[in-house]
Amino acid sequence: MMLLLPLIIVLMMKLSDARTHSLRYFRLGISEPGYGIPEFISAGYVDSHPITMYNSVSQLKEPRALWMEENLAPDHWERYTQLLRGWQQAFKVELKQLQHHYNHSGFHTYQRMIGCELLEDGSITGFLQYAYDGQDFLIFNKDTLSWMAMDNVADIIRRVWEANRHELQYQKNWLEEECIAWLKRFLEYGKDALQRTEPPKVRVNHKETFPGITTLYCRAYGFYPPEISINWMKNGEEIFQDTDYGGILPSGDGTYQTWVSVELDPQNGDIYSCHVEHGGVHMVLQGFQESETILLVVKAVGFIVLAIALAGVGILAWRKRPRGKNKVICLSTPEH
């Protein structure tokens, strides 16, 4: 039995182009550099777009976006190159101290993330945190002017840092004021790239994972910005059981990709449809009407394979943090 289930795409334009934007700076120190991995790396991002890069090999802070290079004078790069050379040495010392207090040797990492977000409603957030070997170590709470320590070593550092009220207030001010000012400035510099919308392309395929069990995959790719909603529906109702989601990942070309899968018994004759919402367009794929923009391939006994061309967005993901031991780490002036 062959079922033809053409799909309908419903397009609803959003009334606002407001988005959440972020500015983040990441730093990574490595105890045993080698195999092409520098001892120290610092990278800046607006949303998911790389804007700056520094490493211990080049020892230069350099632009990673043309609109950054075109809008910031040479003395900006020279000034922050000097700051980052200082951070490079500080990270090396601090990582050695952490290894000593944890009684660790060999390969270990030390990380820092600082940044801010400008939300769709105009409100702001800020974050500053450290990690050791990819585990949370110290997290700054700008509202209470305090640090959250993740273990006994981190707690020793917390007490020292919290004794310096001036430094705590400085970090709060940087996160809430200076960081947001830089973010707005960078958004203006790169507005053509950062505020564009590229709709997702969507493709559905399948494979038999076990005898009598088929897995349907709905893949969205080539979209920007990264915020996207993608899900499977069974007979018109959203399903969560037997469903697996992939992360929203960069594709390497300034767009994003993601996927969702569902396991099914093709003998049951249920109707499955993939629903995608992205950016300024809301796309709903469901059955019972012809649409020239969709290629529908049908399998027997109610099993459908959809190959769809749509529009979409990607999403960013980052995370890695610290876990400490005895040692006092001094905060320096953040780079921009």
Swiss-Prot record:
Q: Which cysteines are joined by disulfide bonds?
A: 116-179, 218-274
Domain comment from the record reads as follows: The alpha-1 domain is a structural part of antigen-binding cleft.
Q: How is the quaternary structure described? A: Heterotrimer that consists of MR1, B2M and metabolite antigen. Major classes of metabolite ligands presented by MR1 include riboflavin-related antigens, pyrimidines and ribityl lumazines, nucleobase adducts and folate derivatives. Forms reversible covalent Schiff base complexes with microbial pyrimidine-based metabolite, which serves as a molecular switch triggering complete folding, stable association with B2M and translocation of the ternary complex from endoplasmic reticulum to the plasma membrane. Alternatively, forms non-Schiff base complexes with ribityl lumazines.
User: Which residues face the membrane's Extracellular side?
Assistant: 19-298
Residues annotated for pyridoxal binding in this entry = 61
- Identify one Pfam family in the record: C1-set
Q: Topology in the membrane?
A: Single-pass type I membrane protein
Q: Which gene encodes it?
A: MR1
- The entry marks the following residues as binding 5-(2-oxopropylideneamino)-6-(D-ribitylamino)uracil, namely 27, 42, 61, 112, 170-171
| One Gene Ontology term from the biological process aspect of the record | T cell differentiation in thymus
- Region entry Connecting peptide, spans: 290-298
Q: Which family does it belong to?
A: Belongs to the MHC class I family.
Assigned GO CC terms? early endosome membrane; endoplasmic reticulum membrane; external side of plasma membrane; extracellular space; Golgi membrane; late endosome membrane; MHC class I protein complex; plasma membrane
* Region (Alpha-2), start-end ranges: 106-197
Function of the molecule: Antigen-presenting molecule specialized in displaying microbial pyrimidine-based metabolites to alpha-beta T cell receptors (TCR) on innate-type mucosal-associated invariant T (MAIT) cells. In complex with B2M preferentially presents riboflavin-derived metabolites to semi-invariant TCRs on MAIT cells, guiding immune surveillance of the microbial metabolome at mucosal epithelial barriers.
Tell me where the signal peptide lies.
1-18
Recorded source organism is: Bos taurus
Protein name (database record)? Major histocompatibility complex class I-related protein 1
Keywords of this entry: Cell membrane, Disulfide bond, Endoplasmic reticulum, Endosome, Glycoprotein, Golgi apparatus, Immunity, Immunoglobulin domain, Innate immunity, Membrane, MHC I, Signal, Transmembrane, Transmembrane helix
Q: Where are the transmembrane segments?
A: 299-319
Annotated region (Alpha-3), positions in chain? 198-289
Q: Where in the cell is it found?
A: Cell membrane; Endoplasmic reticulum membrane; Golgi apparatus membrane; Early endosome membrane
Region Antigen-binding cleft: list its residue ranges: 19-197
> Binding of 8-(9H-purin-6-yl)-2-oxa-8-azabicyclo[3.3.1]nona-3,6-diene-4,6-dicarbaldehyde: at which residues?
25, 27, 61, 76, 112
